Structures are given as structure tokens and as C-alpha cells.
From Swiss-Prot:
Pathway: Pyrimidine metabolism; CTP biosynthesis via de novo pathway; CTP from UDP: step 2/2. It comes from the Bacteria. Homotetramer. It catalyses: UTP + L-glutamine + ATP + H2O = CTP + L-glutamate + ADP + phosphate + 2 H(+); L-glutamine + H2O = L-glutamate + NH4(+); UTP + NH4(+) + ATP = CTP + ADP + phosphate + 2 H(+). Mg(2+) binds at D71, E139. It comes from Aquifex aeolicus (strain VF5). GO terms for biological process: 'de novo' CTP biosynthetic process; CTP biosynthetic process; pyrimidine nucleobase biosynthetic process. This is CTP synthase. SUPFAM superfamilies: Class I glutamine amidotransferase-like (SSF52317), P-loop containing nucleoside triphosphate hydrolases (SSF52540). Allosterically activated by GTP, when glutamine is the substrate; GTP has no effect on the reaction when ammonia is the substrate. The allosteric effector GTP functions by stabilizing the protein conformation that binds the tetrahedral intermediate(s) formed during glutamine hydrolysis. Inhibited by the product CTP, via allosteric rather than competitive inhibition. HAMAP family: PyrG (MF_01227). CTPSs have evolved a hybrid strategy for distinguishing between UTP and CTP. The overlapping regions of the product feedback inhibitory and substrate sites recognize a common feature in both compounds, the triphosphate moiety. To differentiate isosteric substrate and product pyrimidine rings, an additional pocket far from the expected kinase/ligase catalytic site, specifically recognizes the cytosine and ribose portions of the product inhibitor. Catalyzes the ATP-dependent amination of UTP to CTP with either L-glutamine or ammonia as the source of nitrogen. Regulates intracellular CTP levels through interactions with the four ribonucleotide triphosphates.
Length: 531
């Protein structure tokens, strides 16, 4: 039977429960334990697929095609665990399942209630990820005290009781504000947050305190006294320059030993050498490169979380600092790309808004031999830009933006034409891609067949393949049956590549994705040669 760690949050949201959970998992993994993580989201959406990036940040796609919370990206980046649709459970899915069972008569006429029916469904969803794992870390989204989170807290309270004290523990992440006028850290919000948690029936075994500085011993002692937690289990989590420092900071305070003792696990040697190397490169880069990320959701950086992290990973591989400069495609002045920019990134997205600026950025990158990388919609816009400005198809477009375009170089996939629902209906998850020899893509991957994650409805229109190839475009990656274009690149360009898939979802700091690694290498080469 697996051991369970339940992680809750208090005082306010966006404290970093996802990174904290992932960091704890990485430490336990380094001890040789098989660890998985799960995110419980109390919102009523069935999944994150139809949510606005402004509301919720990016949608993270798993190998099996689930559209999930961005925290699953942290889980995969920090650990070796592979997430599936079972690793993200929403209140929407729980209620949907319960109501479906009621309609089928599975409850035999019983009055369906939050307790026991909703809580039992939550518990079953949690236990589903236990298979073949020694430890399951469950992050409960939201903040203690939120109405929508109560059934989830009740469910984990019940589950903890069923598992027994040696098989489960609670970690509460809270916030300790520094009041400038008073010149001191205040523990009262943490005290009240734990009081709220205890009123539900949950006593935390550890409190991780987020603050803008280190917690002095006196503050730790005070929190321990008023929350009924051992002082050694009050962990300081100050603001850090890099998120990849968090495992080191937690290990420094003995979190590994506290957890193994509490869960009656064998304590094993923890070697965080790989994290130290990563942090050392981030702190002491040999050079810097500037990459312009041109998108329409740039006001919220989390909208492009995995892309930004993957660019940083590419920097780690090349021992350079990557300055990701966010450019709003709706307000883009092309002269901004002339100012010390060494690479252009156009990530995925949906809808017509902001398209003009992205196409202008791609045109600038192509004509000025600047390393340029397009992902998903970014690749599709590369095709549109090329059709308009090189092939002379002035009205070329995607049928997503102009259903009546005379040159539909991007068209809806055949199997998508009869789909009338948005949620979970795209081409989602990992699919194979055949890589053509003697191409940039093959040099980067060093493989003939790769598997990458997808999230799209539209594709390159094969009717125009010969037109593109006649002018120097190479379709270096396709589906194994050669029907779907996966990668396109330019022959006579330093580095101009677009991919239909999302490579950012398979990049880790200690295993950077090959495309991002080589893109940053090209940016560095461009900087050395031309600036």
C-alpha cells in the first residue's frame, strides 16, 4: 500500500503549492522511492481544456491526451513521473460522474448527497493513481476556507483516517507577511489558517511558510506553539531567484527526514547533485541571449509557462541565460525585434486576435535570418506567411480565420469537421512523427521516429506541399502515413523551424527538449556572428 502526503494551502492562493509538491516528490525520488502526484481542482469545469489562459494559465497536455492544470507541468519537470488524466481531478468531473451514476440507477434509489457520494467518488479518484507507487502526493487546489474545496478536504480527512497515521500525513502551505510599517513578520494569518483546517478535522503535520525572507527561529517557535506542530516541522520557504532552488532549500531544512520518520519509511541517502548543477548554471551563465516570445496572452506569464521553462532548459544545456522578452502580438512594433533580439518564438494559441503581429514577427525572422521557432499555431502561421510573401498567394489563410479563403494552406482536419463540442475533442496527446533524414530536424533529434504531444484541430493542407517545396520549404516531419505535416523548416536559413506538436511539454531542466536546446544554440550562434 502506498503512503499518502496531502498538501493544502492557506491565507491566499498562488503560493506555489505545485512547485512545493513537485520539489518534495523530487527529493523522495532521489531516495529511490516511486512517487506520483495528483492535483485536485475544486472548480466545476470538467477539465482545463476550455478555460481561458487569462483565468487559469496554460493548459498542460499529458501523454494520454488529457487537458490539465499547469501544475502537472511542474510535476513532470521536477520528477520522472508521467502524468495521465487520472492525475488531475476536478469538481466538475466528480459531480459529472456522480450524476451519471445516479441517472443509471447505480445508487439504487438512495438520496445522493455530498457525503457520502461526492466524497466517496473523490476518494476513489485519489486511490486510482496509487498503482505501482510507493508514495502519492495529493495537492488540493484553492485555499482552506473556500466553499468549493470543502468536499475535497472532507474526502482527504476521511481517507487519511482509513489509511492510518503511519500511512498518511498533511502538509499545509501558508503565507507569513512582512509588515513594513511594523518592521516584523506576522504569524496571525497562519494561525487562523491552521485553525480553519483543524475545524474541518485536519491537523497538519508540517507547515511550510512562504515569505519574502527567511523565518527567524522565534517566528518558527511561535507558529509551532499556536498550530500544534513540532518546531522542526515548521519549514521556511522564502522567495528564491529560481524555482529549481526549492528542492535544495527544503532538503537543507531536513524535510526528507521529517517525512520518512512521520510515514515510517526507511531514510535513504539523498543526492541532489543534479539540482545543484542546474542552479549553478542559472546563477553563473557563460553568456546571455534574448528571445522574443510573441503572443497574445503575455499579460499573464503562466499562459506560456511550459514554453518559457523549456527556453530556460535550452539555456541550461548551452550554459547561457535566456532572457524571455514577452511581446504582445496585438501591439507589436516590428522595430522592437531589431533591438538586441537573438531569436523569435511564436507559441501555440487559438483565434484570429493577434494574428497579424505574429505573422509580421515570423516574416521578420525569415527575411533577416534570425533563429525562429513556431509551435502549433506558430507553425501554421509560418505556412501562411510563406504562402503570402514567397508563393504570392496574397489571400492565403487558415480556414479557422477565414473559411472562404481562396488559398486554405491551413485547413481543419477531416475528422474534426463533424465535431460540434469544444471540450476534449481536439487531436490530443502523444502521436508518432517520422523524421526525414538529412534535415535540421533529424540532426537535432538523431532519430527516425519520435513521439510528441499534440493539441490542435487544424493542419497543413497537403494540396500545397509541392508549391512550398519548390521554394525551399522542407517538410522534415510527418505522421508515419505521410498524411499530416508535423515539422516544416527552411533550407537556406540559419534556423527556421515550425512544429505542429508541443515539444515544451516534454522538456525538463535536467533533460532539455532537443528542439529547445538547439534553438538556443542557434540563438547564441546568431548573437556571436551578427550582433
Amino acid at each position: 500500500m502506498a503512503k499518502y502526503i496531502f498538501i493544502t494551502g492557506g491565507v491566499l492562493s498562488s503560493l506555489g503549492k505545485g512547485i512545493t509538491s513537485a520539489s518534495i516528490a523530487s527529493i523522495l525520488e532521489e531516495m529511490g522511492y516511486r512517487v506520483t502526484l495528483q492535483k485536485l481542482d475544486p472548480y466545476l469545469n470538467v477539465d482545463a481544456g476550455t478555460m481561458s489562459p487569462y483565468q487559469h494559465g496554460e493548459v498542460y497536455v499529458t501523454e494520454d491526451g488529457a487537458e490539465t492544470d499547469l501544475d502537472l507541468g511542474h510535476y513532470e519537470r521536477f520528477t520522472n513521473a508521467v502524468m495521465t488524466r487520472d492525475n488531475n481531478v476536478t469538481a466538475g468531473r466528480i459531480y459529472y460522474n456522480v450524476i451519471s451514476k445516479e441517472r443509471k440507477g447505480d445508487y439504487l434509489g438512495a438520496t445522493v448527497q455530498v457525503i457520502p457520494h461526492i466524497t466517496e467518488e473523490i476518494k476513489e479518484s485519489i486511490k486510482r493513481v496509487e498503482k505501482d507507487n510507493d508514495i502519492v502526493i495529493v495537492e488540493i487546489g484553492g485555499t482552506v476556507g473556500d466553499i468549493e474545496g470543502l468536499p475535497f478536504l472532507e474526502a482527504v480527512r476521511q481517507l487519511s483516517l482509513e489509511l492510518g497515521r503511519k500511512n498518511s500525513m498533511f502538509i499545509h502551505l501558508t503565507y507569513v507577511p512582512y509588515i513594513k510599517a511594523a518592521g516584523e513578520l506576522k504569524t496571525k494569518p497562519t494561525q487562523h489558517s491552521v485553525k480553519e483546517l483543524r475545524a474541518i478535522g485536519i491537523q497538519p503535520d508540517m507547515i511550510i511558510c512562504r515569505a519574502d525572507r527567511e523565518l527567524p527561529k522565534g517566528i518558527k517557535s511561535k507558529i509551532a506553539l499556536f498550530t500544534n506542530v513540532k518546531e522542526e516541522a515548521v519549514i521556511s520557504a522564502p522567495d528564491l531567484e529560481f524555482s529549481y532552488e526549492v528542492p535544495l532549500k527544503l532538503k537543507e531544512q531536513g524535510i526528507d527526514r521529517i517525512i520518512t520518520e512521520r510515514l515510517n519509511l526507511e531514510h535513504r541517502e539523498v543526492n541532489l547533485g543534479k539540482w545543484k548543477k542546474i542552479v549553478n548554471v542559472l546563477r553563473n551563465p557563460e553568456e546571455e541571449v534574448n528571445v522574443a516570445l510573441v503572443g497574445k496572452y503575455v499579460e499573464l506569464k503562466d499562459s506560456y509557462k511550459s514554453v518559457i521553462e523549456a527556453l530556460i532548459h535550452g539555456g541550461i544545456a548551452n550554459k547561457v541565460k535566456v532572457n524571455v522578452i514577452l511581446k504582445n502580438s496585438e501591439q507589436l512594433d516590428i522595430s522592437e525585434l531589431q533591438e538586441d533580439i537573438h531569436g523569435i518564438m511564436v507559441p501555440g494559441g487559438f483565434g484570429e486576435r493577434g494574428i497579424r503581429g505574429k505573422i509580421e514577427a515570423l516574416n521578420f525572422g525569415r527575411e533577416n535570418n534570425i533563429p525562429t521557432f513556431g509551435i502549433c499555431l506558430g507553425m501554421q502561421l509560418m505556412a501562411i506567411e510563406f504562402a503570402r510573401n514567397v508563393l504570392g498567394f496574397s489571400n492565403a489563410n487558415s480556414t479557422e480565420f477565414d473559411p472562404d479563403t481562396p488559398f486554405p494552406v491551413i485547413d481543419i482536419m477531416e475528422e474534426q469537421k463533424k465535431v460540434d463540442k469544444l471540450g476534449g475533442t481536439m487531436r490530443l496527446g502523444a502521436y508518432p512523427c517520422k523524421v526525414k533524414e538529412n534535415t535540421l530536424a533529424h540532426r537535432i533529434y538523431q532519430k527516425d521516429l519520435i513521439y510528441e504531444r499534440h493539441r490542435h484541430r487544424y493542419e497543413f493542407n497537403n494540396r500545397y506541399r509541392k508549391d512550398f517545396e519548390s521554394k525551399g520549404v522542407v517538410f522534415s516531419g510527418t505522421s508515419p502515413d505521410d498524411k499530416l505535416v508535423e515539422i516544416m523548416e527552411l533550407k537556406n536559413h540559419m534556423w527556421y523551424l515550425g512544429c505542429q506538436f508541443h515539444p515544451e511539454f516534454k522538456s525538463k531542466p535536467f533533460a532539455p527538449h532537443p528542439l529547445f536546446r538547439d534553438f538556443i544554440r542557434a540563438c547564441l550562434e546568431y548573437k556571436r556572428k551578427f550582433t
